[in-house]
Amino acid sequence: MTQLSRFLYGGDYNPDQWPEETWSKDIHVFKKADINSATINIFSWALLEPREGKYNFSKLDKVVQQLSDANFDIVMGTATAAMPAWMFKKYPDIARVDYQDRRHVFGQRHNFCPNSSNYQRLAGELVKQLVERYKDNKHIVVWHINNEYGGNCYCENCQNAFRKWLKNKYKTVEGLNKAWNMNVWSHTIYDWDEIVVPNELGDVWGIEGSETIVAGLSIDYLRFQSESMQNLFKMEKKIIKKYDPETPVTTNFHGLPNKMVDYQKWAKGQDIISYDSYPTYDAPAYKAAFLYDLMRSLKHQPFMLMESAPSQVNWQPYSPLKRPGQMEATEFQAVAHGADTVQFFQLKQAVGGSEKFHSAVIAHSQRTDTRVFKELADLGKKLKNAGPTILGSKTKAKVAIVFDWSNFWSYEYVDGITQDLNYVDSILDYYRQFYERNIPTDIIGVDDDFSNYDLVVAPVLYMVKHGLDKKINDYVENGGNFVTTYMSGMVNSSDNVYLGGYPGPLKEVTGIWVEESDAVVPGQKIKVLMNGKDYDTGLICNLIHPNDAKILATYASEFYAGTPAVTENQYGKGRAWYIGTRLEHQGLTQLFNHIIFETGVESLVCDSHKLEITKRVTEDGKELYFVLNMSNEERTLPSKFTGYEDILTGEKAHKDMKGWDVQVLRN
């Protein structure tokens, strides 16, 4: 990470939506809340370039000057995320064609074709103008490329580029036919121009990314689209670095996470990871924690919380107000898991457009005596006090959960067994086990180094690409501990099944093979017997044959009662567990009590009293414990922290933690 010079507190500011005479007053209000940064120019292309090649930076010049004079740090957008109307009129090929084969017209955003040479040229020219103009302004601390990349395109530009991409990957049509198993349903091709993009008029149906005839085609197209958008990012970054090689460059990741963009592939090109976080009102706290751990783990460095909501959002089906104290707790949750910034959308609430009811620092009332503003000012004061200590500190984890976009795509393309396969939910089942025990956890990809961890958990590792099995075997053989589950080791990187019984190349390390998989229908409960107690399970039940593995749990109902449900296998110096069914939370907790004991993985605090507790370590080795009450019920601080200092207030830690209370403690 290119180190930020201070902890950023601020967010998206759109002064181009407001009269110039209001800007200085806005900045004065921001300063009252100890806000020190603003993200600008995200969607200003139409103002900057009203006609092709005719640029007008007069308004942006004034905005930059006023923010610089106020000593604000500026996150400068490149404005390429939403195109002006004239571009659609002059260059129709710029507009993306969606999954239903409809070419978009002017409107919304995420509306460009990533393989349009006209878009690439015009975006590049705008970025060049922008960077040449502002490259020497030292108040610009981050360049923010585009915004929340997404929106796959299925146009002729993309189809032609996809054919070239496939030719480069497979070399011959014979190689492609073999990889995609194209003898199914007379799909064999004899020329590259016979390949068509997988939209609803062809081999796919249902929600985008959910149903396909030829999984190899559909997965490769998602890889291609993610790479195409990444190439746009790389193009803009190259231009920025030519004129400003020092200032860090990012683009904001988003979603739960965004399924269509492989952030692990993108991470190497980011100087710093940034993320937009908008948990729904009913999302459990561990879900947001997982996403923050994923963002931190992409580069194993602190990240930017680029966007979040002071209170309500405008686009979710239901958006209750954040309760008193809840905003501070949710912002500090991001910091606890690795964020070095707290930034909002938006700093000033719009009067029009679809986001006019999205909460802001300056609300429509334009008052500073409101509940939300007072809470924002209190948060600003605490970040001003604690930010210098927190900035740059890191998380050290000995547990890793494997999350992989190719598995995300292929797992949810599975046609058969059950329609209820959900990759993220399956991962969260296992993340929750460590979250509730306050065990620091990294979220890693299949290409990351496993040897850094005492325990690696790879739920639903459906796709095992070439070489991954050897990597897992070597890790376990050398003393590592590995957990995998049902729907693992089933297919190769083209989504073709491994023969010889499941879990395919993972049979050796797990010491089992799976004969069949039963779907558990809605409303049905299957019992699993473990340590003399029955536990409910669902979704899928693997019928397991142990080879070398010992049995930890058996099914207690259905015709496969008495057969293994969970196994443990000694392999070299390490062990591998196989969980053949989706145990409900109580049963999974019982199982992980055993696994965690056996592996020696330690919790930060044993008597957590239902508090979320994480730890960051500063460069000089000081430990910072983030203690968060992510509920509206009163909790008790663990006795371990008696006498610690709360760096948010400078006072001693307090024992009774009211709802949404936060303490950041050091000894």
Swiss-Prot record:
One Pfam short name: Glyco_hydro_42M
UniProt keywords, alphabetically: Glycosidase, Hydrolase, Metal-binding, Zinc
Reaction(s) this enzyme catalyzes, per UniProt: Hydrolysis of terminal non-reducing beta-D-galactose residues in beta-D-galactosides
pH dependence: Optimum pH is 6.0 for both lactose and ONPG hydrolysis, but lactose hydrolysis activity is more sensitive to changes in pH than ONPG hydrolysis activity.
Reported biotechnological use: Has potential for lactose removal from dairy products at refrigerated temperatures.
One MF term in the entry's GO annotations: beta-galactosidase activity
One biological process term in Gene Ontology: galactose metabolic process
Key word Transmembrane helix present: no
Residues involved in Zn(2+) binding: 113, 153, 155, 158
Major enzyme class: hydrolase
Activity over temperature: Optimum temperature is 37 degrees Celsius for both lactose and ONPG hydrolysis. Retains 16.5% of activity for ONPG hydrolysis and 11.2% of activity for lactose hydrolysis at 4 degrees Celsius. Stable at or below 25 degrees Celsius, but loses 50% of its activity after 1 hour at 37 degrees Celsius and is inactivated after only 40 minutes at 45 degrees Celsius. Can hydrolyze 73% of lactose in milk in 30 hours at 10 degrees Celsius.
SUPFAM superfamilies noted in UniProt: (Trans)glycosidases, Class I glutamine amidotransferase-like
Keyword Magnesium: no
Record: residues binding substrate: 109, 147, 315, 355-358
GO cellular component terms, semicolon-separated: beta-galactosidase complex
Catalytic residues as annotated in Swiss-Prot or TrEMBL: 148, 307
UniProt xrefs under PANTHER family: BETA-GALACTOSIDASE GANA (PTHR36447:SF1)
Family note: Belongs to the glycosyl hydrolase 42 family.
Protein name per UniProt: Beta-galactosidase LacZ
Organism this protein belongs to: Lactobacillus acidophilus (strain ATCC 700396 / NCK56 / N2 / NCFM)
Organismal lineage: Bacteria, Bacillati, Bacillota, Bacilli, Lactobacillales
